[in-house]
Amino acid sequence: MDSVNIAALVLRLALGGTVIAHGWNHAFGGGKLPGTARWFESIGIRPGRVHALSATVTELGAGALLVLGLLTPLAAAAVVGTMVVALVANHARNGFFIFRPGEGYEYVLMITLVSCALGALDGGAWSLDHVAGFSVPGWAGLAIAALAGIGGAALLLATSWRPAPAASPAPASESAPAA
């Protein structure tokens, strides 16, 4: 059983650390929080400042909870939610591979699936969940991580995502060269 606990610890530290770094970059990287807010606005998630702050706090908090192994399925659900929003609002239209122009959905999909797996796996014996006697492993943990995350993302997208309309092609008479 130690192999499962080792896997849970490695996944929690890797995923939690990555999500913390992502949230930290929202707040303190390049354009800082105002730059993140402008980026949210540019992909149609409005108001940008509210969502930049919300995403930053969610990623920092969920990442810390994962590292500690505290409320693991709920922390995983928070990560699933933020990644599903990123997938739908920005990455899906760019194809699968992250190296493609516009960055495809490969990265956010993997973070989402690892989060779901960690929800199913639970925090493991070396977690604060274990110390507190909190455990929701298996299908129940997976359901919490996946369904709460997807549900939260769907709610956010339904209420706050307003992408710019796609440009319609010019009528044939306007695009054809004059004779």
Where do the protein language model's features map onto the residues?
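Physicochemical signature of membrane-embedded alpha-helices that form the seven-helix bundle of GPCRs
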Residues: 51-58, 78
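Alpha-helix C-terminal capping segments
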Residues: 68-70
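Hydrophobic, membrane-inserted alpha-helices
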Residues: 57-66
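Short, amphipathic, aromatic/basic-enriched membrane-interface segments that mark the entry/exit
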Residues: 43-53
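Membrane-embedded helical hairpins/re-entrant loop segments and their flanking transmembrane helices
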Residues: 36-44
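Extended, low-polarity transmembrane helix blocks
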Residues: 1-31, 35, 49, 72-179
